[in-house]
């Protein structure tokens, strides 16, 4: 057995292999197909986004894609990616994973006019000088998740602004009136107590 090992070692040193040499990476060898091409999953990026051509700086709608009527029209949005901030991780400051979505709020006809006005008042800090509503997300290390988060933020804004306040019932009006009366009564009581304390501290100068 030892002699056989020595013979194999000597032949390998001389450049002659009795058996085919082992693969450098077993995982890569398993992923190789019979025709020599590398196996790729159906969820690989080049199969999910065949028209992207490796571009990670901007997002565009693939050709032939249909947009649902109840969803956000992606062709009216300006979507871009940039470096994600924050400490730690190998992808930080190396991959464009932070998503930024912006659109002109005043001309967004896919949102009702009253809803747009309410969004402009409620989220005025997210609107720039050009009237663009800007939303960003860097909660994930993946671009598509951050993009989905930005779109969900837009949906939440529209849903929140679309809700109309409910009319108060008679019981609510009565309860509100009682609370105001109790609050005024307590305020006057505290005022009388404070006035009595100030009067007790007063010293007569004879």
From Swiss-Prot:
Tissue specificity is: Down-regulated during the in vitro differentiation of HT29-D4 colon carcinoma cells.
| Compartments, record wording | Mitochondrion
Where does the transit peptide lie? Answer: 1-29
A single Gene Ontology MF term assigned here is: translation release factor activity, codon nonspecific
| Keywords from the UniProt entry | Hydrolase, Methylation, Mitochondrion, Protein biosynthesis, Ribonucleoprotein, Ribosomal protein, Transit peptide
Does this entry carry the keyword Protein biosynthesis? yes
Give one GO biological process term. Answer: rescue of stalled ribosome
Coiled-coil portions: none
Q: Which Pfam families does the record cross-reference, listed alphabetically?
A: RF-1
Q: Which domain of life is it from?
A: Eukaryota
UniProt cross-references to InterPro entries, sorted A to Z: Mito_Release_Factor_mL62 (IPR052104), Pep_chain_release_fac_I (IPR000352)
Task: One GO cellular component term, please give it.
Answer: nucleoplasm
Catalysed reactions, as listed in the record: an N-acyl-L-alpha-aminoacyl-tRNA + H2O = an N-acyl-L-amino acid + a tRNA + H(+)
Residue numbers of N5-methylglutamine PTMs? 90
Q: How is it modified after translation?
A: Methylation of glutamine in the GGQ triplet by HEMK1.
State its Enzyme Commission number(s).
3.1.1.29
What family is this protein classified in?
Answer: Belongs to the prokaryotic/mitochondrial release factor family. Mitochondrion-specific ribosomal protein mL62 subfamily.
Explain the purpose of this protein. Essential peptidyl-tRNA hydrolase component of the mitochondrial large ribosomal subunit. Acts as a codon-independent translation release factor that has lost all stop codon specificity and directs the termination of translation in mitochondrion, possibly in case of abortive elongation. Involved in the hydrolysis of peptidyl-tRNAs that have been prematurely terminated and thus in the recycling of stalled mitochondrial ribosomes.
- Note the PANTHER family from the entry: LARGE RIBOSOMAL SUBUNIT PROTEIN ML62, PEPTIDE CHAIN RELEASE FACTOR
Quaternary context: Component of the mitochondrial large ribosomal subunit (mt-LSU). Mature mammalian 55S mitochondrial ribosomes consist of a small (28S) and a large (39S) subunit. The 28S small subunit contains a 12S ribosomal RNA (12S mt-rRNA) and 30 different proteins. The 39S large subunit contains a 16S rRNA (16S mt-rRNA), a copy of mitochondrial valine transfer RNA (mt-tRNA(Val)), which plays an integral structural role, and 52 different proteins.
Protein name according to UniProt: Large ribosomal subunit protein mL62
Annotated source species: Homo sapiens (Human)
